[in-house]
Amino acid sequence: MVANDQEQIKIAREYFTRADQGRPDVLELFHEDAEIYFPKFGFGFGRNSFLEMVKGFEGVLEYIQHDYDRLNFIPSADYLIVEGTSQGRMSGKSWAGGETPGGRFCNAFKFRDGRIMSLHIYLDPDYTGEDEARFRWGKNRKW
């Protein structure tokens, strides 16, 4: 890995920490023209669109904690792919990536000028497995 890769990993780690703690200064990590993608939210443009996306969880997300020690970082030039798991509680129900259907994710970061220019988050937003009708293979799977 080159120095730039290490800097991008450092920024991504800081993003997960600040986001999990609900810190408003998470926005400082984003470029002012950042692009955000999240399932069911779609695309947002500008760093404040991150807050717009987060507002969709108000009143239901009690907490989220990414498993920092289990994050896999795949750097490539201006991009950093991060695969991992999270745990949390939403509307009184808990999830834990690797143990429940929800909680696995993959984030694609793109950097410009030392900031997050693009963040695309790929996951199933049904963290707690409420959408039982679409568990076509049953719930007795290895997660």
What do these predicted ranges mean?
Residues 2-4, 55-143:
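A beta-strand edge to alpha-helix "cap/lid" segment located at domain peripheries
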Residues 23-77:
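A solvent-exposed, acidic/Ser-Thr-rich amphipathic alpha-helical stretch
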Residues 1-32, 137-143:
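Short, low-complexity N-terminal intrinsically disordered segments enriched in polar/charged residues
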Residues 5-15, 38-41, 62-66, 117:
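Short, mixed-charge, low-aromatic patches
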Residues 20-21, 46-49, 107, 124:
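General structural signal for secondary-structure boundaries
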Residues 12-15, 25-27, 34, 50-53, ...:
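Hydrophobic pocket/interface hotspot
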